[in-house]
């Protein structure tokens, strides 16, 4: 595998800009974790025209879903796995998919996705701005799985107010609802009502102000001076001392702190200054104490660790401790769209991500964090690197950033201004490509690995259902053709290939994948081997009169049976027991003929999934009629390639490619995802087969040697 063919001048990548269809489509993550007996909040990510309504079956006792918002809430049940079948409906159709609640020590089972205020507001974001930006996140990003908003540092400035137990309080000049003992609870309640999790940034240690006052530590006999360590300052924030995390007093301090945050309704905490350059590890005793304090707090809180402006390149030394205690941890200094001063640029990020891709022993729920995404508009009060501006990354570099973060995978924390997305179609399309996000949020939680290096890189990542993601990253400035054999990627046979940034199926590749990658850009594909199932991804839609039985986009796609008019749909009517035929895979039965319950049901029109190749609609119509039914539906697919997975999952959970065309039922027309189309348009990928000539290989070798002489091997 590697680069073949001569380099060309750089072109600007064109990604699919197609908006989601009017009919509902359920998005990931499809697995979410929570701690037993703690408050539960999860808003179903769903796209489609307003107004959506939601129903669910399989909800544990004490857990409900709000019909108008899709917010699942209540008290997390006992440890276990709870599949919940969710249906979203609107005037254009309906969609059904299964979400799995995993109760246990199981937060952040897929990389967290959200927005942090720092890149756009520095230390100055206000309560009203958090509400406004949270509203924008809810409208533009949450339907695709972005579900957290975080206030970054120094929310206690000006004034550094503390309570009687030495704990910082929000500055009421910025957060007027935090008067008295309210803290952040009124703001957290408003964020939760949007279906979003609420997070804050804090500094490691204890306020010097509290130490000087020797404040009593709540619910203990200790004081601030018992816990604090004035020989362990933060090197860049003169408000804090360290804490003796391995002492009873230090543990009491952190217990008190996190009990306060839990009472405020905080769901996500980013702790800064966690790196200790002298010991070459995170401040491990404090990390241990923080973990214990969170577990005692009675609330499920995602723990994010940030190093501060130190060199985290040796952090794999701490990997075991981090995997035990943290949900995510930074692996770079602050990542920006420039390399000014101590900041981390794209080359720096590549180096760190390569390092962590090779670290073993990491498990789902514990993620190396390549930092926030400085994309879109960075302002209105950006503090670092050039003031307010649209990101300095080129469009090609922006696609590379999103691809690389997806392949590691890293948490996806947007740093740009969400309110600007309504007038920034490019950035919105970049952040909401559901096929790329499905790789990021894949339930297998596998880590990516670099399989080819040099001036161009190839990365692969195992996905659920036996599939693979492969990314071709062009580190050069000129366009280049890159290729990899399927066997070198661990794929047997000829897989179905899906180009995710262009939302297009790729045909004609039998033993290898050869693609043209614009300079400084990246392309990402999914490979679905013959006979494998599709992913559990986005639930597709059935038409206004049909049951929620459409297979989702991707390997779950195929012709679907709609519910016939005249009665309750039969058991097979809601999408059939298998998905659809995958190209090269098993020809799938579509909706299936579902007899009505008790003889009173109407017929379901199932599609006999006769096609297993790359063309054609689904097969003949089928359907039985219950005693009270009025007619059988028709299940012929409307055209296009039928899915890309093999045997798809049940109830219309998604696969890796576009959904197959829908069938028509007596009660309405089902809406599939459009077969092999690019979901109503989008861009086609420049995919060409190429064979290297001896001359071209000599040219590439000479160019690489010249680059090494000029810039060093790591930058070539």
How does the language model describe each region?
Residues 119, 137-279:
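Aromatic-lined carbohydrate-binding/catalytic grooves of carbohydrate-active enzymes
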Residues 399, 405-408, 413-415, 452-491:
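Carbohydrate-binding surface patches
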Residues 227-232, 244-246, 252, 256, ...:
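Glycan-recognition surfaces
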Residues 508-533:
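C-terminal beta-strand-rich structural cap/linker in extracellular carbohydrate-active enzymes
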Residues 61-78:
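Strand-loop-strand motifs at the edges of beta-sheets in extracellular beta-sandwich domains
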Residues 704-716:
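C-terminal membrane-anchoring or membrane-association module
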Residues 10-48, 93-111:
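Extracellular interdomain linkers/hinges and stalk-like, low-complexity segments
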Residues 4-9, 532-705:
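Ser/Thr-rich, Pro/Gly/Ala-heavy low-complexity intrinsically disordered linkers and tails
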């Amino acid at each position: 595998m590697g680069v073949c063919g001569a380099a060309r001048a750089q072109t600007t990548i064109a990604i699919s800009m197609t908006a989601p269809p009017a009919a509902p489509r359920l998005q990931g993550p499809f697995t979410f974790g929570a701690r037993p007996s703690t408050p539960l909040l999860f808003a179903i990510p769903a796209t489609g025209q307003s107004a959506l309504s939601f129903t669910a079956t399989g909800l544990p006792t004490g857990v409900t879903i709000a019909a108008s918002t899709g917010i699942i809430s209540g008290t997390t049940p006992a440890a276990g796995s709870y599949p919940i079948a969710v249906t979203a409906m609107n005037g254009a159709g309906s969609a059904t998919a299964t979400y799995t609640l995993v109760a246990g020590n199981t937060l952040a089972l897929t990389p967290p996705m959200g927005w942090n205020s720092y890149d756009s507001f520095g230390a100055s974001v206000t309560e009203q701005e958090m509400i406004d930006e949270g509203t924008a996140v809810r409208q533009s990003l949450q339907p695709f799985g972005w579900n957290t908003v975080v206030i970054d540092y120094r929310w206690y400035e000006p004034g550094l107010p503390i309570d009687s137990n030495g704990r910082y309080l929000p500055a009421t000049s910025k957060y007027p609802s935090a008067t008295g003992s309210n803290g952040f609870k009124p703001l957290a309640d408003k964020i939760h009502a949007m279906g979003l999790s609420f997070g804050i940034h804090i500094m490691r240690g204890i306020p010097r102000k509290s130490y000087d006052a020797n404040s009593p530590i709540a619910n203990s006999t200790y004081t601030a001076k018992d816990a604090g360590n004035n020989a362990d300052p933060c090197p860049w924030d003169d408000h804090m001392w360290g804490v003796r995390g391995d002492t009873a007093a230090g543990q009491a301090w952190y217990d008190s702190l996190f009990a306060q945050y839990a009472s405020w309704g905080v769901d996500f905490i980013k702790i800064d200054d966690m790196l200790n350059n002298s010991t070459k590890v995170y401040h491990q005793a404090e990390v241990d104490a923080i973990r214990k304090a969170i577990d005692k707090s009675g609330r499920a809180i995602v723990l994010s660790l940030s190093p501060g402006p130190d060199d985290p390149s040796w952090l794999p030394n701490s990997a075991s401790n981090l995997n035990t205690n943290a949900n995510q941890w930074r692996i770079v200094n602050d990542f920006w769209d420039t390399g000014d001063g101590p900041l981390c640029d794209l080359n720096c990020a590549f180096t760190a991500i390569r390092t962590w891709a090779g670290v073993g022993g990491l498990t789902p729920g514990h993620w190396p964090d390549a930092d926030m995404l400085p994309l879109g508009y960075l302002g209105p009060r950006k503090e670092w690197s050039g003031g307010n501006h649209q990101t300095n990354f080129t469009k090609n570099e922006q696609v590379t950033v999103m691809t690389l973060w997806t392949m590691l995978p890293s948490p996806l924390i947007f740093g740009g201004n969400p309110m600007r997305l309504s007038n920034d179609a490019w950035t919105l399309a970049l952040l909401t490509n559901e096929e790329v996000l499905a790789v990021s949020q894949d339930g297998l939680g596998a880590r990516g690995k670099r399989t080819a290096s040099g001036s161009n890189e190839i990365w692969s990542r195992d996905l659920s259902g036996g599939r693979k993601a492969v990314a071709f990253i062009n580190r050069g400035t000129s366009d280049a053709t890159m290729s990899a054999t399927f066997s070198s990627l661990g794929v047997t046979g000829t897989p179905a290939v899906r180009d995710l940034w262009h939302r297009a199926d790729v045909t004609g590749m039998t033993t290898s994948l050869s693609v043209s990658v614009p300079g400084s850009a990246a392309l990402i594909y999914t490979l679905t081997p013959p006979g494998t199932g599709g992913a559990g991804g986005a639930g597709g839609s059935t038409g206004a009169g049909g049951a929620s039985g459409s297979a989702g986009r991707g390997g779950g796609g195929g012709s679907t049976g709609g519910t016939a008019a005249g009665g309750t749909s039969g058991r097979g009517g809601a999408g059939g027991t298998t998905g659809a035929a995958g190209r090269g895979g098993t020809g799938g039965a579509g909706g299936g003929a579902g007899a009505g319950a008790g003889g009173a049901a109407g017929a379901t029109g199932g599609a006999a999934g006769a096609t297993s190749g790359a063309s054609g609609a689904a097969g003949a119509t089928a359907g039985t009629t219950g005693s009270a039914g009025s007619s059988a539906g028709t299940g012929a697919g409307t055209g296009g390639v039928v899915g890309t997975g093999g045997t798809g999952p049940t109830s219309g959970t998604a696969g890796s490619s576009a959904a197959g065309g829908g069938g028509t039922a007596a009660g309405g027309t089902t809406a599939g995802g459009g077969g092999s189309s690019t979901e109503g348009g989008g861009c086609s990928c420049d995919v060409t087969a190429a064979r290297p000539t001896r001359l071209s290989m000599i040219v590439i070798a000479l160019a690489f040697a010249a680059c090494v002489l000029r810039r060093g091997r790591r930058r070539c």
